[in-house]
Amino acid sequence: MTEYLLLLISTVLVNNFVLVKFLGLCPFMGVSSKLESAIGMSMATTFVLTLASILSYLVNQYLLLPFDLSYLRTMSFILVIAVVVQFTEMVVQKTSAALHRALGIYLPLITTNCAVLGVALLNVNEKHDFIQSAIYGFGAALGFSLVLILFSAMRERLAAADVPLPFKGGAIAMITAGLMSLAFMGFTGLVK
């Protein structure tokens, strides 16, 4: 049980996919201008990342490895992710049309979010079992959500602040992201 808790904490804080591994930067910068959109994207990405991790593990263990098709791993994981994203988009569209409009193009772009594919591939490379794969995917999603929501809240506050003209927009966003990354470096050594 302790091993699973350490894996979760490590994935959320110590090895955060956005601030440490630099995966998932497109939605991180693109959806973070409004808190409401960031929360919606966080929920959708959490669902997709967790489910894609589990399904990718199952595809790898019960389809690719037994038939010696490991060379199809990346393509099959992309297919799994695309199916999960399509399912998620249909659910979001049926349950919340406003959220679907707010997320816009970023919802289908979860398919190309490198963090989702990165989690699936890292699960295989680190030889996680089923439960570890699920926890790793969920932890990566929680870490992504935490960073996205915090960054979004800071960007909303910065939009209302008196920022010098050369720093407005993307420049101050990059500086803020860098400072967040430095803050998350403080968690290094928390989990070995």
Curated annotation (Swiss-Prot):
Gene (name only): rnfA
EC number: 7.-.-.-
Stated role: Part of a membrane-bound complex that couples electron transfer with translocation of ions across the membrane.
Listed GO biological process terms: electron transport chain
Protein name: Ion-translocating oxidoreductase complex subunit A
HAMAP family for the chain: RsxA_RnfA (MF_00459)
Key words, A-Z: Cell inner membrane, Cell membrane, Electron transport, Membrane, Translocase, Transmembrane, Transmembrane helix, Transport
UniProt organism field: Shewanella sp. (strain W3-18-1)
InterPro entries: Ion_transpt_RnfA/RsxA, NqrDE/RnfAE, NqrDE/RnfAE_oxidrdctase
Tagged with keyword Translocase: yes
Subunit: The complex is composed of six subunits: RnfA, RnfB, RnfC, RnfD, RnfE and RnfG.
Record's bilayer topology term: Multi-pass membrane protein
Class of the enzyme per the UniProt entry, highest EC level: translocase
Location of this chain's protein in the cell: Cell inner membrane
